[in-house]
Amino acid sequence: YRGNIMQQTAKMSGARVWLNKMKTTFSKPQNAILLALGILLTFSTIAPMISIALDTVTVHVGSVDSHYTGLNEGYTLYNWQDLFTGRLAKVNLWTPLLNSVLLSVFSCVGAIVYGGMFAYLVTRTNMRCKKYLSSIFIFPYIMPQWTLAVIWQNLFDSNLVTGTSDGLLAALFGIRMPLWWCQGMFPSVMVLSLHYAPFAYILIGGIFRNMDANLEEAATIMGTPRLKIFARVTLPLVKPAVLSTVLLVFSSAMGSYPVPHYLNLTTLCTKYVQMGEKRAGEASILAVIMILFGVLILIVNQRTTSGRQSYTTVTGKSGQISLVNLGKVGRCMVAAIFCVATFFTGILPIILFAIETFLPNPGDYSFIRNGAAGNLTTKWWMTSENITENGMYGQKGILFNEAIWGAFKGTLIVAVCCALLAGTIGLLVGYCVSKNRRSKWAAYVNNMAFLPYLMPSLAVGVAFFVFGSSMGIFNTYLLLVLAGTVKYIPFASRSALSSMMQLSGEIEEAAIIQDIPWHKRMLNIII
């Protein structure tokens, strides 16, 4: 009897100790918020993935799986069997998959070569016009992907080759580029490489700026050839930035839809849209494949960052950087080449888009050939009715078009809501993870917050499309806000985490000693 009492007492004391630990743990706001964020991010990230995984084996009424199985409801593996081994497997899966992988790989190579070379020239040489070029070089990354794709069409398309209206070169100079130049893999790779090159420049250029010049100077004093210094000293230091660029550009290019769509390249994204409702289950499998690529990239990122080498300069970093001398002619010539390149990728798109809005018809550049400004028109802007005006396809001008203004209003609503929600959640993730750096739960929350960035955008959209349909919020602003928030949380969380890592813990501890509430500490100190 006495032994039973002692066992019960031990159990009660153990439970009391556990409760006290829980109270102590969750008395800290960052721990309670971290738990809530983990549950929220798990639901918002994993639940749509589960929904789309179930959609791959669900029978869709009116789809091919329902037709060939004779079922109107339930589950079937027909979609998997038909997509991987069916008569159209090559067209629906293997060719788009190969094109997607090749597009992602070549875009990575192009972005790193172009952006990395520009970063080296700006930070480590005496090239002229550095400030101007640094500012204009990031323009393609600021602009949407489809803008460069449309500019490529407006420059190189021709009625004889592509069957569309003549582009600028064909209309003015009679130059008609071959089909492989106008459509397909090559232009898609070029456009995405130019679009993501600023991303490589930002990451790699930051390493070049902060790199200790003493390391290269020591190798120079030892008589090491400059090429060997670059290969054995410089490249290992920028390897983390290059690897980060590869992972992020690969995942972004894998999920690119507008560029392959405009430039007529069949990828997983474009094939998903083409399948539509007739092969809804097989289309969901394509989205699952893209999600698996994102998960694979996350695993590779974790493996590489966990085993990454650390280069530490014990004696401090030199502030003097020895710039490579390109020579009087070389520094001007290199600057001129990049000025021309950045003009075509950063300034010309804006000019051409502005001109296109005043052309009477697409590809009609007669005002340049004839020198007659009267051939231009403002009908695309100023037409206030859609009955007597010809060539407007039943639409009013953009300034009087209710549909355009409604879409603009909806875009602003979604953008503002996504920015506020993603910014707030990302800030809280960065704050809580920085306060629990050694916690496995914090690492899990950080990975859940970052995972949507590594997944193709279309895959995220498809997952929320299926999830929203099952939850009854399909075709609502709420679904758009949820999908946009989850997709852009990684940007906010990573930037917030980087900022929180720079804050000393003593600042908040001093406020805690003064009994300042948590919300005031966040508003007046942390933020």
List the predicted regions and their residue ranges.
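Transmembrane alpha-helical segments of polytopic membrane transport and secretion proteins
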Residues: 1-36, 128, 303-341, 440-442
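C-terminal transmembrane helix and the adjacent membrane-cytosol boundary/short C-terminal tail
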Residues: 5, 13-14, 129-130, 198, ...
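Short, membrane-interfacial amphipathic segments enriched in basic
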Residues: 7-23, 68-77, 83-86, 370-374, ...
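Membrane-water interface segments at the C-terminal ends of transmembrane alpha-helices
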Residues: 29-65, 84-208, 237-257, 262, ...
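Glycine-rich helix-loop "coupling/hinge" segments at transmembrane-helix boundaries
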Residues: 65-69, 157, 255-278, 314-317, ...
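Short hydrophobic, aromatic-rich alpha-helical segments embedded in or entering the lipid bilayer
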Residues: 70-82, 264-274, 352, 368-386
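Residue-level signal for the nucleotide or nucleotide-sugar donor/cofactor binding architecture
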Residues: 75, 278, 376, 403, ...
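Short helix-to-coil transition segments within interhelical loops
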Residues: 125, 211-238, 265, 436-437, ...
